[in-house]
Design a protein with these regions (language model features):
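Alpha-helix capping/helix-boundary segments
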Residues: 76, 129-131, 270, 277-278, ...
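Membrane-proximal helix-turn-helix segments that form the acceptor-binding/catalytic region
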Residues: 57-64, 85-89, 104-123
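Conserved catalytic-core segment of nucleotide-activated headgroup transferases in glycan assembly
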Residues: 152-229
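A short acidic/histidine/glycine-rich donor-binding loop in glycosyltransferase catalytic cores
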Residues: 285-291
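Nucleotide-sugar-dependent
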Residues: 225-266, 272-280
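N-terminal pre-catalytic "stem/leader" segment of glycosyltransferase-like enzymes
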Residues: 1-90, 273-278
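A charged, aromatic-enriched C-terminal amphipathic alpha-helix characteristic of glycosyltransferases
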Residues: 292-299, 305-340
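A short, active-site helix/loop in glycosyltransferases that binds the activated sugar's phosphate group
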Residues: 105-108, 119-143
């Protein structure tokens, strides 16, 4: 039997929780059985803890020899316990990684993280670069890749009229100087296009070239898919416009940012850092532009023909359809079960 462990998610507005609940829905559609309690969204810390704990304690009693149990990582303090209980029951554990605590948050050392992950039988990493990092640091489990996060939504992108220059660029996410200081510098290099910003915390008076910014405020993801204003979606993190720096920026070399999937569902070709792990996916599928620095973006957009853009947009719509159907999670789980 194919199983998964649901839990409490503190609301569904964050990208991380959206990715996890989407994967639960895909597994449910594949007739996987939830061995935990019913999914809940309590924001109260005590209720969240109690419901997740109750589901964790229930799970081992529902597992049998030969079962496959899918866990979404991190599961924090419960992860090793659930893996050990599953193995005692004769089940195999498949892990889908969402976040590595030894990178951005430094919640674990690399050694602690690998030791924890080695309780799994099979790990689905975000991409080939994350897979290699796990191998290089001593991960003993079998490894596969996701490719990109799926993005479920009943909403569809609104068809746009033919796009004309100058192109506009959309950025969605945390907009404060602490998280993404590059937003306050990039205006220096913007002359002929606009940046449309979606999210909270943008301090427009601190931004250079502020006349090129349109601050749209926070918009729910389903609404953004239907109403996104822009021609490209920007994937960039850190303090610098020249490269992606800091813990958040450097993590792009291994991580699949969930916002990339949101942009694709909006039918927006992607602009992404050339060294980002997802840059390979963007190049291989012809769904955007990979840049070394945002300083060169003005020139690149000015030289991109409307025909080239139309082809990118067509390819982006095709990938977006796959994301809406859970294609990548389905494929990764099927491969995991076949290899175990």
């Amino acid at each position: 039997m194919n199983c998964y462990l649901s839990r409490n998610y503190k609301g569904l507005s964050s990208a991380g929780n959206k990715a996890k609940t989407d994967i639960e829905q895909i597994m449910k559609d594949l007739s996987f059985k939830n061995v935990g309690l019913k999914q809940t969204t309590y924001r109260n810390k005590v209720l969240s803890f109690l419901f997740t704990l109750a589901g964790v304690l229930k799970a081992p009693f529902c597992l049998h020899k030969g079962d496959y149990l899918v866990l979404q990582y991190p599961l924090k303090k419960y992860f090793s316990f659930v893996c050990n209980m599953a193995h005692q029951k004769g089940a195999k554990v498949i892990v889908i990684i969402h976040d590595l605590g030894s990178f951005r948050r430094k919640a674990l050392t690399i050694e602690q993280e690998i030791s924890r992950l080695n309780h799994a039988d099979y790990i689905i990493a975000h991409n080939e670069k994350m897979k290699k990092w796990l191998e290089d640091n001593g991960c003993k489990a079998k490894l596969g890749i996701l490719g990109i996060f799926d993005y479920l939504s009943a909403t569809s992108a609104t068809p746009k009229q033919d796009t004309e220059k100058p192109y506009s660029v959309l950025y969605a996410g945390a907009l404060s100087p602490r998280k993404n200081a590059f937003l306050y510098e990039v205006g220096t290099f913007v002359h002929s296009f606009n940046l449309n910003l979606y999210g909270n915390g943008f301090e427009i008076n601190q931004a250079k070239g502020k006349e090129h910014f349109n601050y749209m405020g926070f918009v729910k993801s389903d609404d953004l898919i239907a109403t996104a204003q822009g021609d490209f979606g920007l994937v960039w993190d850190g303090t610098s416009v020249s490269t992606c720096t800091g813990d958040f920026g450097e993590y792009l070399q291994y991580n699949n940012p969930h916002k990339t999937s949101l942009y694709i569902r909006c039918q927006l070709p992607v602009i992404i850092w050339n060294k980002a792990a997802l840059a390979d996916f963007v190049r291989e599928n012809g769904i955007g532009i990979c840049v070394d620095s945002l300083e060169e973006l003005e020139k690149i957009l000015n030289t991109l023909s409307e025909e080239e853009y139309a082809e990118m947009k067509k390819r982006t719509a095709k990938i977006g359809e796959q994301l809406s159907q859970g294609h990548f999670v389905r494929k990764a789980l099927q491969e995991a079960i076949e290899r175990l």
